Amino acid sequence: VGSEMCIRDRLDSLAAKFETEDFIKDDPIQFLHRFNDKGKEDAELAGFIASLFAYGNRKMFISKLNDLFARADNDIANYVKNGDFANLKGMEYRFAKDYDIIPVFEILNKLYSSSKGLEELFSYAFKSENFLQTVVDYFYSNAPKTAEHGFYHMIPNPANGGAMKRMNMYLRWMVRSSEVDLGIWKFMQPKDLLIPLDVHVARVSRSMGLLNRKSNDFKAVLELTEKLREFCPEDPVKYDFAMFAFGVELNKEKLGV
């Protein structure tokens, strides 16, 4: 128990140190803050779209997102609702080509035409038996028959057992309220969130003895989130910042910085 207390204290201090406004400028959450002044729909759409591209090299995907939002005249809610996505032709990032990206926008257009949009979809799904699967199934049921790997990489299927890192990160942005996270969705509480698990968070968690599972999959997400709930039941995902910070510090030690 003593060593667990030490770990918790270390995580708490790292989380407090890194979860500050200064974190925003180099993180994809910058797009939610940029669009939040325009309104809730703009922030939730900017966040959802940013989360789809948030993998690989951070500088690269942030630059790609700047390009994408510029094509949308930095008016993302109106752009989605207007439904003319011709100027996304030629847009691509790693696995996603324009013929993968445009269908996502077309589905979002349909969602906002027929409902209150992403908040309504996610809140409806949250009440269902299988939260993330219900969200994803909406996109799959409206996907073109020609949808290819790039589309399914942007919106992965939870049934495959993956960590669903980007969707859990999006939920962190939208549900937690802090200097960094917006907290504009109220249908769920921070205690309901799951840790966004990537290779860095997984490596740090294992090195601290918080995660035993060897695969970085959904079962690992549940195991680690349960452990973090022991430290902070009402807000386990705040430790995402601590894990990130710890990973950065470990790298510095390796590099001798």
Regions found by a protein language model. Give the residues of each.
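Charged interaction scaffolds used for protein-protein
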Residues: R8-K252, V257
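Short, small-residue-biased leader/transition segments that mark boundaries at the very start
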Residues: V1-C6
